[in-house]
Amino acid sequence: MNKEFDTLQMQAIEAHDGKYLVLAPPGCGKTEILAERIARALDRGVKPEEMLCLTFTNRASRGMLNRVCERLEAKRNELDIFIGNLHRYCSIYLINNEVIPENAYILDDDDQTEIISDLNSTLVHYRTGNINRNAINYISGLATYIDQRRMGHPESVLPSGPGVLDTKSGDFLTRDFSYFYDIAGRYNFDPQLIPSQHQALTCALQYSAYKKSHTALDFADLLVLAYDHMVTHTDHIRYSWIQIDEVQDLNRLQLAIADELTAPGATAMYLGDEQQAIFSFMGAKLSNLDILRKRCHGHVLTLSSNYRAPSYLLDVCNTYAEQVLGVSPEILPRAVRDEPHRPLDLILTESDDPEKEAMRIEGMVDYYLKLDTAGKERMAILVSCNAQADTISEALTAAGKSNFKISGTDMFRSKAYKTLTALYSVIVNDFDMGAWTRLLYGLGCLRTQIATRDKVHAMRSLMLTPSDLLRHKPYIRQVYELYTGGEAVVFDTETTGLNVLEDDIVQIAAFKIRNGKKVAGSDFNIILHTDRELPEMLGDLPNPLIAEYASRPHMDRAEGLRLFLDYTGSLPLIGHNITYDYLMLRNNCARELQEDVTFTTFDTLSLAKLVAPELKKYTLASLVDTFGLQGENAHLADADIEATLSLLDHCMAQAAGVLRAQEQFIANRSTQLIAARLGKIAPLRSNITSYLHLPVSVTGRTIADDLAFTCRTLTEQGLIDEIGPKFDIFLRYVQSEWVQRDSPGTLFDQVSAHIRDLTVSINEGDLVNSDELITDRLFIMTVHKAKGLQFDNVVVLGVNDGTYPYFTADNVLRSPYSTTEMKQRARAQIKEDARKLYVAISRAGKRLCLSYTRVRQYGYLAGMSPFLHSVSHLFHTGRRS
């Protein structure tokens, strides 16, 4: 064991055979506990495929995954355990269970905002261009609610909203989602028939219709569809060992999904901290902890030792937790580090107004950085909103103080970054229409994403991808002309495994086709000798190659490969998922014959995706079944090529009807302009493709190296803007987190393994946790983005009455017109604001400064937050200004 654990930590680590709730305040070693539990479960014989580890954030999942790999001394891509957030899990689940197409367009927040604001232009201010985010969220929530009601989901997992935007007054009306569902039901959900005064409802229905027509899903859809499939398919996968982190941040639907994934009698551990429940605006339900307390009765543990904060800082957190949050002193953590402190380690300072407070920030920064003589301490300035973070960062940068800001303007959401990563997405998957949309839009092929998405959708309906604009002829036309007037070899291989760099080909089967017909007497079928062990199972099925190998004579490997090359000559090769077989062939020939062989290849997998892009699965067996074709996918090469030819015949029959329309579409002037713009990246794309499947050990080019090169090339060509200095930090992150922690493989392997990280899940907060990556010692961010992070010195700005708690909640409580429901929500918001401030003060590891102003923005009276009354005596009081 690499670390000693205290008694309560050991109880949490060794807990099994039951359901457990572990309440873990900040600094109690939660991540180490989670990692150790996984290691010990594996030691006890729990199978990796029976284990599931869910986290709330991608940052948390990466931290846990890294700890587990360090503990097990394993590479990340060797660990067959899902460790990640629920959205990611549901995405994989939906594809594996054929609920959504594998190339479904997953809309991010920016996509969602653009689509909804395009459907309802009143959501964009006509002068400033500012978008009403609250209305966007309401409309998307309403669309989700309607979908769930139509699916018959129970009330307990439905979203709820405060009201709908009144487009005349700009205010929200207190109408429940169910009110609008009832209206929609009267008109059979047709948005064109909804009365004009219900614009939000119309927009929600139009948004749902848009997603359906474009095979698109948003993040909420991933959860809703996964839950619906689970409750209607009781034989779905369940796990006998499951642990879920940050349960206080889950909404009811997410908790219900986790419950569906938990097998009867499973070992289940839930970890959370109600003092850090600050995500109700995302649907999180603090009451989940009450549900879990009852579920885990008798198995509730509260970790009581804080290993991170010195005693004087923990005294502040504990006093606040007891007096403001109402936490029993019996369960508050004790400090392991009983260190003396100087008076200025805890500062409470007052300024006249926000402008004066901002003027003092530079002095605060100088003070804390001068205390750090070793130059290793990190400082955070925490604020309540993104706009304030932007303003402070700009001012400090202008003053020559380098800082790392995390706000709403995340580098990973920039147009330049999305364009860069979209290029890699389409290189590894030509049928990712979402990535093509981002790439074409980012390159300036069309003016808006809406127009770009529609153009890509039109191409999809014509059996085209934008790659066809870079070819001399569209892919499907090339195959059609070869099929109807040429000669080719249909072939397949069976192998000892899936590693194209190392595994052996064992069987090669082929025949020739000419003018769309199989050439009589052209059958080719050999077994090659191998010293490698054949896998006993192919998924859930016994491997038929074992019996075939045992019953037939074996050829010398070099002799057999030479025989096939002589048989093929220079003819093109056709196969299903031919990239795999072709790479196997090339690498086997390189090993056995010391020859670099190349062929023109065509893939029936690609043809099927062009012909039927809406399908959920594209294995040879499923396509034979879906299209009612002859042949079977027997996992023996000689049988599989017969099925492949049957699939080829079907695809060519379908293609014949669109070739003329393809010609007309490509000849259109607007398409030609897109092709010309897209052509600017053709040499770069071709270059990357040339070494995509070569071992990184040969090319010396990792994913980090390639991202740097491609970004530089696109920038120099003026195709994307400068991404900025944070991109260099990201490249160091990629090298340390992905390249060094994974087995090397090829560039294709690295990109494929991390394409979701590249394009969806990463954010600037993921870069903060390593001193090795970021040389900046000063960080600026909102409290929400600071959750889960730790800094030596923390300054919390604007700790005012009116911010903590937010003034609107007080206004609701004072108003004689507020309903009981409105007052309940206001009280809940005040409690959450109190927890938000707790999260802020608990980020500090050495020193803490809380700053407030006597008046807030626009001259409203403020003063110190009432939440601080119970702890103000613990602080040194700073001067006024």
Segments predicted by a language model, with ranges:
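P-loop NTPase Walker
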Residues: 1-102, 238, 315-318, 838, ...
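Inter-lobe coupling/hinge region of RecA-like P-loop helicase motors
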Residues: 2-6, 10-26, 49, 102-105, ...
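Conserved helicase NTPase motor core
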Residues: 2-14, 18-23, 60, 82, ...
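ATP-hydrolysis module of ASCE/P-loop NTPase motor domains
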Residues: 15, 78, 99-196, 300, ...
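Conserved P-loop NTPase-based nucleic-acid remodeling module centered on helicase motor cores
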Residues: 50-148, 158-159, 290, 600, ...
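Conserved RecA-like helicase ATPase core segment
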Residues: 255-346, 522
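Conserved helicase C-terminal RecA-like lobe
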Residues: 426-487, 514, 662-855, 859, ...
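Conserved non-catalytic scaffold segment of RNase H-like nuclease domains
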Residues: 486-489, 496-586, 590-598, 617, ...
